[in-house]
């Protein structure tokens, strides 16, 4: 059995995450023998609306790097303003406006992105609507009333134009990945690069102090 290599930083996962990534099955770079990579993670409060700072960060770098995770159902309901059973139970309203505030928060930090667990094509082509097209994969449930009053065609326009507009307005990049696993790997590699680039900007003394502070 190959001995795993411990990742040099700890991933912080927001304690409100309902389906968290745990970064299992990753491997180190070739210069480290392509060994299995053990990624330590901890659950933490990364902020609550209106001060939320994404779903994932790095210990010691909260407020510097953040990844906002969106499942397919979540990105639909957020952009189109639908109310899911989960949100009704928790009294969460106005998801679209709340998310715009979250994007403002991401834009204010050096490295903040949105990662979606589905490709853009799937988000568009499988769009439900009030005129009869229902999405019934995975755990998606809910009435057409919860999904809004717009037709599929209208929903597609609203969704696509919102994604384009919000990226231009808030300067926060969105990455639509081919699957949940692809999104998980992408998010980790983004955090990894943000960690490396942060350390590169420190002097040797500052780097030593920083590593000691988060050990």
Model segments located where?
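Non-catalytic C-terminal interaction segments of nucleic acid-processing enzymes
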Residues: 1-63, 76-215
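Conserved catalytic cores of phosphodiester-cleaving nucleases, focusing on short active-site segments
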Residues: 65-71
